[in-house]
Amino acid sequence: MRLPQARLDQVLDRFREVEARMGAATDGAEIVKLSKEHAELRPVAEAVERLAKLSAERAELDVMASDPEMAEMVRDEIQALDEKLPVMERELALMLAPKDKDENASAILEVRAGTGGDEAALFAGDLFRMYQRYAQTQGWRVEIDSISEGEMGGFKEIVASITGDGVFGRLKFESGVHRVQRVPATEAQGRIHTSAATVAVLPEAEDVEIEIKESDLRIDTYRSSGAGGQHVNKTDSAVRITHLPTGVVVTSSEKSQHQNRARAMKNLKARLYDMQREALDSARSEARKSQVGSGDRSERIRTYNFPQGRVTDHRINLTLYNLARIMEGDALDDVINPLIAEDQAERLASLEESFS
């Protein structure tokens, strides 16, 4: 992709302007804001300068190659640069392409059993463990915020916070309906059953992004219970918060009531923030119908066929036969990376349109 020089000059000009303003700024809030923009622009500006340097070298080699005596000497260098420049241009184009501003955010993961009764709850449990193990391989921290266990195991619903760099960017394409085809442990005649679970991945909202009025909240406490209905706590420590304007309900059921309130508020902010994002997305939906990971919760995004050891992601027609390793979390990148690549292709196409 040939990037317009005017766009590259614009990046460098803005980077230098921010650097100059940082040196003169005295207001703390402005310094923080400029520092953040500087950190975002720096790798882009450096990439622009590297590309300019290599392009200049390539132009010099063309001049040298016009001399018959020098042409043979510089042929290999020209070939090497002709291979390197398009790669650098694509990397730079991705930096310039429209980005999800929550790409690097931590996330709230919600997994719920769908159709299929006990088997759906067991599958929801399998999915959560897959994400939990994947998070470990990425060095992310997982904290369970609320849980409702299935009668035969697994989860009717489980909500967890996943903290780390780039969590939302890697997991956001997991949102949707996941379908499983397998023989349940309770199936005496060996028949294959189909059930489903839903996954929602929400970017964790910054405090400054969502304002919640205390008067809009109803906060209830209740006694949390574990599997089989056994009371875990002697006191009413679990917290349920209802956001009255939207009807959104969040819960947290750890031992500390203070911690539960803080966690529930964090999850409420994430839910309200996600609603804001979806409202903006729906306004742009006509222009983005083909975008991978649109977040449509009603969409069946993936099928896990245990008898065949097959995983199929329906959005990009990807079929893999390493189901066991994917469910262990070891090979989940085999699904995530192609989805990210498809998203990058969409963003590059959008960038090219903006240049035309």
UniProtKB/Swiss-Prot annotation:
Residues with PTM N5-methylglutamine: 230
SUPFAM superfamilies in UniProt: Release factor (SSF75620)
Chain ranges passing through the membrane: none
Gene3D superfamilies, per database record: 3.30.160.20, 3.30.70.1660, 6.10.140.1950
GO cellular component: cytoplasm
Keyword Cytoplasm among UniProt keywords: yes
Keywords: Cytoplasm, Methylation, Protein biosynthesis
Region (Disordered): 279-299
Listed Pfam families: PCRF, RF-1
UniProt PTM comment: Methylated by PrmC. Methylation increases the termination efficiency of RF1.
Signal peptide coordinates: none
Biased composition (Basic and acidic residues): 279-289
Localization: Cytoplasm
Gene Ontology molecular function: translation release factor activity, codon specific
PROSITE patterns cross-referenced by the UniProt entry: RF_PROK_I
Cytoplasm listed as a keyword: yes
InterPro entries: PCRF, Pep_chain_release_fac_I, Pep_chain_release_fac_I_sf, Prokaryotic/Mito_RF, RF-1
NCBIfam families: prfA, PRK00591.1
HAMAP family: Rel_fac_1
Role summary: Peptide chain release factor 1 directs the termination of translation in response to the peptide chain termination codons UAG and UAA.
Similarity comment: Belongs to the prokaryotic/mitochondrial release factor family.
Entry protein name: Peptide chain release factor 1
Species the sequence originates in: Caulobacter vibrioides (strain ATCC 19089 / CIP 103742 / CB 15) (Caulobacter crescentus)
Lineage: Bacteria, Pseudomonadati, Pseudomonadota, Alphaproteobacteria, Caulobacterales
